[in-house]
Regions:
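Acyl-thioester-dependent acyl-group transfer interface
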Residues: 1-59, 81-106, 246-449
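Non-catalytic, low-complexity flexible loops and terminal extensions
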Residues: 1-10, 127, 131, 135, ...
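A generic structural signal for well-ordered alpha-helical segments
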Residues: 41-42, 225, 236
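Structured interaction and signal-relay segments at domain junctions
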Residues: 62-75
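Histidine-centered acyl-transfer/condensation active-site motif
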Residues: 86-87, 99-147, 157-168, 389-406, ...
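Alpha-helical hinge/cap motifs
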Residues: 125, 225-232
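Hydrophobic/aromatic-lined pockets within catalytic cores
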Residues: 128, 141-148, 226, 240-249, ...
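Short amphipathic alpha-helical segments
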Residues: 232-241
């Protein structure tokens, strides 16, 4: 086995190991295991350096030696995992515990980007060899296949987390897309016939490797999480929506400067810097429906659309009474008039979907919530979107708004009013709303498989 084959085989062994393996005890993250994982990852980095440095210079020119690229592996693979673990440790101390579903989301997030980093390294090396006229040996092909097998296993693990926890974090679909893309590119590289040019593989590789979500957004997420100590939920939601919009519409079709704010973040951080973490170009991609003018039919159609898309339920009366009153207090009167149901019924609504919630997080106070619930966009498309869901045993409201149309002070006021209104929701009123909905549509929502 030549030097490169040996090194790459060892590299595949190291990378396929789970860099962010953490023991979850009783639904919480073990602080001692977090520390152990950090120490282990630092040791892994040293092992990588010793491995490649020891075989990098033998006195003879070996163009297959990959020791010059060890900086890529060390900085982009290991440091990402270490940064994730340290951020988790900080979050654990700050919040006393990290919910299981958040841990799985962060873990999947880390694995997906490690896959992309390895893919970038492999692609660069293969292109360099192809230009130099080298052919892939059987040993090297075996190593590439071994690495691709590891990526497939990791992608399968993400699928199993989704099924076991009945969890659909906004990021998981996109993470799965990247993992599958990485596998496809690797398979393409190792199965081409000898003498075939590499050009047909280059565009697909570049499209993935230069994707904004794979590079810029990751740096933003890691940097801002470390600086501000913010939770992953709102930032990852922003990044996922942004990336999915680019994937669906193309970069040129994204317009408007959109930001995400949620009352949980504003309540914990009275700092103007918090908005910088959410400052990104976002154009949400959600299904749209055309509503009828009849009020009763509109409410029923809206409820059926939500049930069909998310297998959830909508508190129609809460939607009409509470949130419209909030909007009337904080927004100009002429704009608030446009929010009347008779006007909204004549235009398109974007149906929001914050994703399902983990089993065990289905209660708001003493009120049990079936699956999860969201509200349609209160404002004309492109202006504002309010997403309701439950997160970590509390009701969460996330606002996606156009920074060019709304002042930050208005959004903060809106968040405060929403929080006050939501605290006024009693058991009796919720039961009455639930009974009204059940009377209109008695069928229970079917769980997503």
């Amino acid at each position: 086995m030549n030097d490169f084959s040996f090194q790459f085989s060892r590299l595949a062994d190291l990378v396929n190991a789970n860099c962010s393996e953490i023991l979850i005890v009783g639904g919480k993250v073990s602080l001692s295991r977090l520390n152990e994982a950090i120490v282990f990852e630092v040791s892994r980095r040293k092992t990588l350096r010793r491995l490649f440095d020891s075989t990098g210079n033998t006195g003879q020119e070996n163009r297959h030696t990959i020791s010059p690229q060890i900086g890529v592996i060390e900085q982009e693979v290991s440091s990402h995992a270490e940064a994730e673990l340290r951020a988790l440790l900080v979050a654990n101390i700050w919040e006393n515990s990290v919910p299981v579903h958040r841990m799985h989301g962060i873990k999947a997030f880390c694995i997906a980007f490690r896959n992309l980093t390895v893919l970038q390294f492999v692609t660069s090396h293969l292109l360099s060899d192809a230009r130099a006229g080298y052919e892939l040996t059987a040993d090297v092909v075996d190593s590439y296949n071994k690495l691709a097998d590891g990526m497939e296993l990791q992608a399968a693990n993400i699928e199993s987390w989704n099924g076991d926890l009945e969890l659909r974090l906004s990021s998981l679909d996109h993470i799965r897309y990247f993992s599958i893309a990485a596998i496809r590119i690797l398979r393409d590289f190792v199965t081409f016939e000898r003498g075939t040019t590499m050009s047909k593989f280059v565009p697909s590789a570049r499209d993935i490797l230069k994707h904004v979500f794979a590079r810029n957004t990751l740096a933003l997420v890691l940097r801002k999480r470390m600086e501000l100590g913010v939770t992953l939920h709102p930032i990852l939601l922003t990044a996922a929506v942004k990336a999915w919009a680019i994937h669906k519409f193309g970069r040129d079709k994204i317009e408007g400067s959109y930001r995400i704010a949620d009352m949980y973040s504003f309540r914990r951080y009275a700092s103007s810097d918090i908005q910088n973490a959410y400052d990104t170009m976002v154009m949400p991609f959600f299904p749209r429906i055309k509503l009828r003018e009849d009020v009763t039919q509109t409410v029923l159609q809206l409820q059926r659309a939500l049930d069909k898309e998310k297998h959830g339920r909508i508190f129609a009366e809460l939607y009409r009474q509470r949130l419209y009153r909030i909007a009337n207090q904080v927004l100009p009167k002429n704009f608030a008039i446009q929010l009347a149901l008779r006007c909204i019924a004549k235009t398109e609504l974007i149906i929001t979907n914050a994703g399902t919630i983990e089993l065990g997080h289905t209660r708001f106070g003493n009120v049990e919530i079936v699956d999860f619930f969201s509200f349609p966009q209160l404002f004309p498309p492109g202006r504002m979107m309010i997403i309701f869901n439950t997160f970590a045993d509390e009701l969460r409201a996330t606002i996606v708004y156009d920074a060019q149309r709304f002042a930050r002070s208005e959004i903060i006021k809106l968040v405060e009013l929403m929080e006050q209104e939501l605290q006024l929701i009693g058991d009796d009123s919720c039961r009455q709303i639930g009974a009204a909905i059940a009377a209109n549509d008695p069928a229970e929502p079917q769980p997503r498989h």
